[in-house]
Amino acid sequence: MITKVMNQKDWEKGKQTGEIIEDSLREEGFIHCSSLEQSTEVAKKYFSNEAEVVLLVIEPDLVKAEIKYEVASNGQKYPHIYGVLNVDAVVNVIAFRKENGAFVLPATLDYK
């Protein structure tokens, strides 16, 4: 499984259209994703000012576009989706909440 941190508004739009298209896809050619373990750091870095954030749990085998694991400037490998993300590849959506100013994953998480 891979994950995608995004704001609730963009997720709602994606559900309406059946696909997620981000600015990064237009500008860099791919959609940024992460592992579950990397997701809290991603949320902290890019979504600290967002009120409503969700964590999409994605089944890679259901993603129609190519997924490449690439090394970022911090030395970690991240999954990048080279095309639109079809929403039927999203197998779970989790409200990503802050506790004491930090994003925290739920204690029980359906992550296969």
Model-identified regions with their sequence ranges:
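Conserved, structured core segments of small domains
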Residues: 1-112
